């Protein structure tokens, strides 16, 4: 049985960045990814392939607490969900780490503070090529240095919109974005960034920024198409000693001194529960029964602001956000949330969600809309949880809360 110092399960922003941080210390590291490298192909930038055919989503289904099957928003590739994310890389606010009272209840404090993480935020912004501008957002936490790269310039339509917001007393700011707009960089500011894979590898995803650089070190190994079935403990159940992997139709075992599960909230939970044994009958690390509980996903709304008299010619739209209501709003003394621009919506994207609406109507809307992502916080609820069915299927129970914001 092969042996490593570290086994890292998952190659997304968590697992990939950890491998990058460990790469130069001489430790023998194995990265395990259940998928493969996402191919660079014309379909990367085709609306129908990405949004209608779901080309890059897995075929597996998860299930709600009512038993209804749904296709999860996960992407099993090297780089994980960062392969298709919108490239927004903001820091949490200082207060986010503290006890925060919401209209619907209390958001408990983290065991660490913003100040504990600030140096690591600074380093991560360098690694992920973050473009931004300090001093524009009134909720911004303290920084030890400027952003490593200047803010992404706003296109004229968006710049004019920001001026109108400022005249109303709001503080739109340049949203921190992880894209390669360095001198000689690959980014072409296209309309197929948010929600799409980047065909030219200009998005600051975990694949391009941390996994591939880590693999330049001979002590770092990547196994793709490697599904981790179980974590196996010593006979007394006190430590994990090996990982059971399904690869190329075979079941393999690999040992490690340290095993890190970084395969996402739901899949890490499922892995711990699948790994139940006589010493841990309810799953690993689950004496309290809390594994999988208090599942949170934010309260999210995609909003199109349509002016029928004013076309929006913007191509790269996702450059600004508003946090004026982050901690409270007019007549509402509780946190409300964040407004940020989406990548420019296209008619084909709308058609994938509303297939029975006339395409001419969807095209007219997309041509004249400014597209927003409106996000507020949900709160921990032990009944919102991830469980496994008797057949091993993943069940997710999530009931929205804190909706007044």
Residue ranges and their predicted role:
Residues 24, 35-40, 217, 226, ...:
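Glycine-rich loop(s) and the adjacent beta-strand/alpha-helix scaffold that form part
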Residues 66-73, 110-114, 288-404:
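FAD cofactor-binding and catalytic pocket of flavoenzymes
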Residues 40-44, 81, 87, 96, ...:
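Short, solvent-exposed loop/turn and secondary-structure capping segments
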Residues 187-189, 234-241:
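A short, glycine/Asx- and small/polar-enriched loop/turn
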């Amino acid at each position: 049985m092969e042996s490593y110092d570290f086994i890292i399960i998952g190659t997304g922003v968590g697992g990939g960045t950890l491998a990058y941080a460990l790469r130069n210390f001489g430790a023998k590291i194995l990265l395990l990814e259940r998928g493969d490298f996402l191919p660079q192909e014309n379909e990367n930038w085709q609306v129908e392939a990405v949004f209608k055919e779901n080309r890059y989503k897995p075929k597996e289904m998860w299930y709600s607490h009512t038993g209804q099957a749904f296709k999860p928003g996960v992407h099993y590739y090297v780089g994980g969900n960062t392969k298709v994310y919108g490239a927004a890389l903001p820091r949490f606010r200082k207060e986010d780490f503290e006890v925060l009272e919401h209209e619907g209840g209390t958001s408990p404090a983290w065991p660490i503070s913003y100040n504990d993480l600030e140096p690591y935020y600074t380093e991560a912004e360098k690694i992920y090529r973050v473009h931004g501008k300090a001093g524009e957002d009134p909720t911004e936490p303290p920084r030890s240095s400027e952003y490593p790269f200047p803010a992404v310039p706003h296109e004229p339509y968006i710049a004019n919109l920001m001026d109108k917001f400022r005249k109303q007393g709001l503080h739109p700011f340049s949203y921190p974005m992880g894209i390669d707009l360095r001198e000689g960089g690959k980014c072409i500011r296209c309309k197929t960034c948010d929600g799409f894979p980047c065909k030219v590898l200009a998005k600051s995803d975990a694949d391009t920024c941390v996994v591939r650089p880590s693999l330049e070190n001979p002590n770092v190994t990547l196994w793709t198409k490697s599904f981790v079935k179980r974590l196996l403990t010593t006979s007394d159940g006190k430590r994990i000693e090996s990982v059971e992997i399904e690869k190329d139709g075979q079941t393999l075992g690999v040992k490690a001194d340290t095993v890190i599960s970084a395969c996402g909230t739901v899949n890490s939970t499922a892995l711990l529960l699948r790994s139940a044994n006589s010493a841990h009958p309810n799953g690993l690390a689950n004496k309290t029964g809390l594994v999988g509980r208090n599942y949170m996903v934010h309260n999210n709304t995609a909003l199109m602001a349509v002016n029928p008299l004013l076309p929006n010619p913007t191509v790269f739209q996702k450059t600004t956000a508003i946090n004026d209501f982050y901690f409270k709003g007019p007549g509402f003394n509780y946190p409300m949330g964040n407004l940020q621009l989406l990548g420019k919506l296209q008619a084909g994207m709308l058609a994938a969600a509303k297939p029975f609406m006339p395409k001419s109507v969807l095209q007219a809307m997309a041509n004249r809309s400014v597209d927003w992502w409106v996000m507020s916080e949900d709160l921990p609820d032990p009944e919102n949880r991830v469980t496994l069915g008797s057949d091993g299927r993943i069940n997710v129970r999530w009931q929205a809360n804190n909706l007044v914001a």
